[in-house]
From Swiss-Prot:
Protein name in UniProt: Ribosomal RNA small subunit methyltransferase G
Binding site for S-adenosyl-L-methionine: G80, L85, A131, E132, R146
Originating species: Xanthomonas euvesicatoria pv. vesicatoria (strain 85-10)
EC assignment: 2.1.1.170
Gene name linked to the record: rsmG
Signal peptide (from-to): none
GO cellular component: cytosol
Nucleotidyltransferase among keywords: no
Keywords associated with the record: Cytoplasm, Methyltransferase, rRNA processing, S-adenosyl-L-methionine, Transferase
Gene3D superfamilies in UniProt: Vaccinia Virus protein VP39 (3.40.50.150)
MF-aspect GO terms: rRNA (guanine-N7-)-methyltransferase activity
């Protein structure tokens, strides 16, 4: 399947969402190419439980891009990225960002390598590894995690990757009061941003945790 094989309402939904998120319409083409590849591979390899391309636009692409305004340039490790979410959409829309896609599942890692080749995305690479086994201490300015664990759990497996003063950006649903209260020593919440994801009902928050 190429992006032309996606239904017109899929591309229209993405274009509306990009406009609502104040992102350049030119990003629609590479995002649709990524989406078409994900839809095709998902039929065989079960990369995501979301099967409908229109739903993927909202729950995968636009949800991932909701954190984009809060990420500066630099280096970013996306922990437990699955098929590349949010890392690949962020790499597409932030070409000055160097993204490492951390995923231990072999079929998901293979898919991401093919996606990076297909998209000619030179600012992203795949690390086929569990986050806790990745031997790159203090190598990253930012960590992201979209659906991995509690804040403390994310820090336990990936905190060593973040440089002092760096930030963990964790996507959450409702405001995570208990998770914030359980942060380990040396980690503090910088900001919590309520997010609006076009087409997605329910609360979404981006928790920015800083490493002391």
């Amino acid at each position: 399947m190429n992006d032309a094989a996606l239904a017109p309402d899929v591309s229209a939904a993405l274009e509306r969402g990009l406009q609502a998120q104040s992102l350049d319409a030119a990003f629609a083409a590479p995002l649709l190419r990524y989406l078409a590849l994900l839809v095709r591979w998902n039929k065989t390899y079960n990369l995501t439980a979301v099967r409908d391309p229109r739903e993927m636009v909202t729950r995968h692409l636009l949800d991932s891009l909701a954190m984009q305004p809060y990420i500066a340039s630099g280096t970013l490790a996306d922990l437990g990225t699955g098929p590349g979410l949010p890392g690949i959409p962020l790499a597409i829309t932030r070409p000055q960002l160097q993204v490492t896609l951390v995923e231990s599942n072999g079929k998901k890692a293979r898919f991401m390598r093919e996606a990076l080749r297909h998209l000619e995305l030179g600012n992203a690479r795949v690390a086929e590894s569990r986050a806790e086994a990745l031997d790159e201490p203090a190598a990253y300015d930012h960590l992201t995690a979209r659906a991995l664990d509690t804040l403390a759990g994310i820090i336990a497996v990936g905190g060593h990757l973040l440089r002092p003063g760096g930030s963990l950006l964790a996507m959450k649903g409702v405001y995570p009061h208990e998770e914030i209260a359980a942060l380990p020593a040396g980690w503090t919440v910088g900001e919590v941003h309520p997010l609006q994801v076009p087409g997605l009902e329910g609360e979404r928050h981006l928790v920015v945790v800083r490493k002391g």
